[in-house]
Amino acid sequence: MSDILDKIIAVKREEIAAALESAPLEELKVQASARDSRDFVGALRDKHAAGHAAVIAEVKKASPSKGVLREHFVPADIARSYAQHGAACLSVLTDERFFQGSARYLEQARAACTLPVLRKDFIVDAYQLLEARAMGADAILLIAAALDTPLMIDLEAYAHSLGLAVLVEVHNRGELDEALKLKTPFVGINNRNLRTFETTIDTTLGMLDAIPDDRIVVTESGILSRADVERMEAAGVHTFLVGEAFMRAENPGAELARMFF
């Protein structure tokens, strides 16, 4: 595991310990059970069935590698813009320390539209899955680089029991081999190396031959132009998680439409 990832995971464990003090497990279970759910898997499949790219549009203020991406950051407005311009789902960063995200941002974005929402964070404990449901998430991300396989399998099973869809993220073939032991149909290939934060979309293109036909590839990070989209679609990839390109645009939803539709 990288120094950066090590640091993030250590902070996550500190945050979970503190959260358990302020919101005990049983209290969080009550909050989680009160939330309705939206069909994350169905929203992506519906786009495919209609012959369109399925875009998971990200609400992200900043990143460790790029700094602040959007100074005027209003999650509700961004979510509405995405919904109006053809996004299938939202992804909202909830990590505060490294990405300047917030659970409030997820709640605000979800309340502003009818799209299903992925909680984008570094999940290392089942408590975070209850947090995700309590804040209104419909799906969560499991990062293979941050988890051993038995824990990843256990977290997926618990997520599904809570009604959360799962996107498992990999960056290399070793991680892919482990990720394919999960049941989720969605395999995210992160074009950004979490060890170095270097990015190339060739990462996705170079791993496609190892993905079984019953899995849906989600290409993540580094999709910055219409040309990038066309390269992916020519290779048979039709599901995208995009944040930076939209966040840097004056109108995020209009940029989504320009790149994809």
UniProtKB/Swiss-Prot annotation:
What is this enzyme's EC? 4.1.1.48
Which PANTHER family does the annotation name? Answer: INDOLE-3-GLYCEROL-PHOSPHATE SYNTHASE (PTHR22854:SF2), TRYPTOPHAN BIOSYNTHESIS PROTEIN (PTHR22854)
- Sequence similarity: Belongs to the TrpC family.
* Keywords of this entry: Amino-acid biosynthesis, Aromatic amino acid biosynthesis, Decarboxylase, Lyase, Tryptophan biosynthesis
Q: Which PROSITE patterns match?
A: IGPS (PS00614)
The reaction(s) this protein catalyses: 1-(2-carboxyphenylamino)-1-deoxy-D-ribulose 5-phosphate + H(+) = (1S,2R)-1-C-(indol-3-yl)glycerol 3-phosphate + CO2 + H2O
Give the pathway annotation.
Amino-acid biosynthesis; L-tryptophan biosynthesis; L-tryptophan from chorismate: step 4/5
- Read off the Pfam families from this record: IGPS
Can you cite a GO biological process for this protein?
L-tryptophan biosynthetic process
Listed name of the protein: Indole-3-glycerol phosphate synthase
Q: What GO molecular function terms would the record report?
A: indole-3-glycerol-phosphate synthase activity; phosphoribosylanthranilate isomerase activity
- EC primary class: lyase
InterPro entries registered for this protein in UniProt: Aldolase_TIM (IPR013785), Indole-3-glycerol_P_synth (IPR045186), Indole-3-glycerol_P_synth_dom (IPR013798), Indole-3-GlycerolPSynthase_CS (IPR001468), RibuloseP-bd_barrel (IPR011060)
